[in-house]
Structures are given as C-alpha cells and as structure tokens.
C-alpha cells in the first residue's frame, strides 16, 4: 500500500485516528498532516489506528495525509549530545530558536546532531579484527572532560573489512565496515539511531556496592544513594524538590548528568541552564555543562511530548552508560509525567 493511502479520520487533542489499512505497527513513527507533525502509533484496532502527536494539532482535519516512517520512534545518538539542550523528542532547542524564533514552530524535523561539525576521530580497530556488540571501534573528544566512545551496535558481530584513516569526520561519514557471518556489510559512523522505548541491552546488572557522593552531607549521611540505584524526592509544592535535584546535578560525583525537566516550569529550566553554564565542576574545573545534557519539556509544551521525554532521557543516559561512564539521570518531575499519562489515557477513552 502506498504511503498516501493513510489519512486522518478524527482529531481529539493530541490523539489522532488514522484510516487506510493495516500496515502500521505499534510504536511506529509517522508524520501527520500537511505540516508533517511528528507522531507515534499507540493503538492498532481493526482498520483504525490511533496516533499520539508530539506537536500542537490545531488545524488538522480529516482527509489529510499520514506518512509512515517504517521504523519505531527513535533518536539519534552520537557526539554532540553533551553541552546541549533538547526538547522532549530530542530536537536541539538552540537550532529551533535559529529557525523559528523564541516559539517552537510546528513541523520542524531537526536532527539531534550537527551535520556540519567535525570531530577528531581515532580508530580503535584494524582490518581483520573480530568484533562483537559493545566493542569500541572509534573514539573522539566530545567535550573538555568526556571522550566519546563509539561502540558496535547490539546484534552485530563479524570481521572488520575496512577502516577510515584517523582524522576529522562528521557524524554521517563512514568510519568502519563490518562483514557479518551472513556476508552482509555494515557501515558504522559516529552516530547511530535507537528506539526510545527499547531498553539498551546489558550482560548483567551489577550489584550496588559504592555510594553516589551527592555533595549534600545530610543525604550522604542519613539517606545514602548507591551508584546503580534509584531515589525519589517526595514532597508538597514549594518544599524544595527541584532545588535539591539542582544541587545533586551540580555536585554529585557522577561522570555525566542527564537533567530532564518533564512538565516543569520554564523559569526552573532557565535557572538550571544559567547556573550550569557558570559553575565549574570541582573535579575538572570546567563548566558543568561540559558533562551535562538538558532535556527541557516544560509545562507549556505538548503533553504527548512530555510522556516521551522520559524515554528520551533514559535512552541518552543508557548510551553513555554503555561507554563505561557513571551517569546520573534526574527526572523532574515524575508526578507531571504521570499527569501526562493520565491525560493521554483520558483522550484514548481508557478507564
């Protein structure tokens, strides 16, 4: 069936129903309407497919086209994520500001990584090497404090048949070719894509045997947090939950911080961005942003993107975890994420 065969059947806030066949699968990414708004399939029932749209749906009407992308909702991973700020579906907000001004325009399909910036790449493999999932094939300095390690993707193993020369490359230029046991040749670059709702595989979960030093003596003494563990900060409005998370993000001894503002107030994310840019990391004496990724999905942004932003942050955090770094993921707040889930559930007419 051709792509034009899918059309909008109905619109209910961020939820759009689609007709035209049975070719769409759960979690498939689609572009909705004339402006090609980004959406994701959340229900398939008979000949009717339900899509949640991550942008404002004002102006959509029945009969407009829906274009399937043929892949699940994914984000781009590679050098350039650190020292950057993204929205809930991993679009860089600084590039969005250049293209559309202070307000986010609809239908902006912007890649997460800069296509023109070059990185000084050193190859870690040579022709004839046998490689498997998780093996390092290249590395480059991403910031002044973090070296980016490019790893063989999950599910790929084989023999290296070609490597590029060490030098400067963009995220789209091939670095290594690997031939698998079936004879297929895979070209590996600095960047790769990963579905946000698929956990990155791991061999085993290591036991928690060392503390995360948060820099807050009362937490480290009375409520210690283990590296590899989790902690929650419950409390009423105005109790200082966000300020506590800011302190943990600034001074904890993690290698990388992924700070996720899920439905937070815009001024709180602005404060975090300003402070992280000015403060120095006590270990490296470099700005804190050199080891930080900010994901800003504030309360005035579409509610569907708020739901996806948590998975975006987890995918980025797991990506750097696989490189061997200690990564601290701060999600603020879980209650507003649950609020987004409740609203989506209501739009889907679920109990």
Label for each model-derived stretch:
Residues 42-49, 79-90, 146-167, 187-200:
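Short, compositionally biased
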Residues 20, 34, 69-70, 89, ...:
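Conserved "cap/hinge" positions at secondary-structure junctions
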Residues 82, 191, 227-230, 252-257, ...:
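Short coil/turn connectors at secondary-structure junctions
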Residues 1-97, 101-105:
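N-terminal accessory targeting/assembly segments
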Residues 53, 58, 120-130, 160-168:
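Short histidine-centered loop motifs in beta-beta connectors
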Residues 235-236:
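The Walker A (P-loop) glycine that initiates the GxxxxGKT/S ATP-binding motif of P-loop NTPases
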Residues 98-135, 139-154, 170-230, 244-247, ...:
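P-loop NTPase nucleotide-binding/switch module
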Residues 239-256, 261-262, 266-268, 275-276, ...:
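Conserved P-loop NTPase nucleotide-binding/switch module
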